[in-house]
Amino acid sequence: MAASDVLVVAGTHGNELNAPWLLEQWNRQPDLINSAGLSIQRLVGNPQAKAAMRRYVDRDLNRSFRVDLLEQSGGDLEMRRARELLGRYGPRGDEPCSVVLDLHSTTAAMGCSLVLYGRRPADLALAALVQSALGLPIYLHESDSAQTGFLVERWPCGLVVEVGPVPQGVLEARIVRQTRLAIEACFEALASVRSGVVRLPRQVVVHRHLGSCDVPRGESDQPQALVHQRLQGRDWVPFKPLDAIFEAADGSTVETPQMEHQSIPVFINEAAYAEKHIAFSLTRREVWTMEPQWLDHLSELLS
């Protein structure tokens, strides 16, 4: 089978409905999304979880792409699905794709944002071009041994598109629209790189992952407090000294270690992260100068 430029994956988590619905409409209306002349493969990442309206069946598919799991035989449904996707669409698959876009929604007030895992040059180039076009924030997730095995890491270039807030299992026009615009911006950026007419921004702004924070818990591991009402919904807003972080059931502020000044919380109170004991993650805003070799790496993938 012929190679394709881009693999678009929706429904990696089965209770995130907006991106899969958009792909269904795109299948029915091929002109709905401008592919900018690129060859595209599109699919639902975890159809069994989607049918069950659950994030996953046995384990999180978006943590099932670790090398040690991929090298095993058999295993849980999501482990088998990860191997299936790589075997068909991975760089050495039957229908290899150079770039993967993994489409997600979140219950957190993240707006429309991009997520990178590590500092691969091609990823940085694509994210910088999309940020230049749409102004989207970039969350750079790295150096966190507790969170690994992400789908996009197994392709030569990959971005996660996160859009929220929206409850799990709910379709919302705003989320679909923002997802569609982000997809088209990615396609346009890739097409411009291939054509050689791309204009690189001089800088890219990233929010680099520092770590994650859980709510206070008691001896039984049950939450003893919750995200403070003044913090809820303030993703991307820097912490200030003495900001309240958690509150008790009576509304009183719970004493917590002071957050690093100007650290920036993201994925605040994301529903799916409660099982991972993550109330929010912390980032630091950094401005990086664009490196010419980033674009070279992306251009080589599309040649």
UniProtKB/Swiss-Prot annotation:
Zn(2+) binds at residues 13, 16, 104. Its cofactor is Zn(2+). The keyword Iron does not apply. Substrate binds at residues 55, 62-63, 162, 273. The keyword Hydrolase applies. It is an enzyme of class 3 (hydrolase). GO terms for cellular component: cytosol. Gene3D superfamilies: 2.20.25.160, Zn peptidases. InterPro entries: AspA/AstE_fam (IPR050178), Aspartoacylase (IPR016708), AstE_AspA_cat (IPR055438), Aste_AspA_hybrid_dom (IPR007036). It comes from the Bacteria. It catalyses: an N-acyl-L-aspartate + H2O = a carboxylate + L-aspartate. Keywords: Hydrolase, Metal-binding, Zinc. Its EC number is 3.5.1.15. Binds 1 zinc ion per subunit. One of its GO terms (molecular function) is aspartoacylase activity. NCBIfam families: PRK02259.1 (NF002601). Belongs to the AspA/AstE family. Aspartoacylase subfamily. This is Probable aspartoacylase. It comes from Synechococcus sp. (strain CC9902).
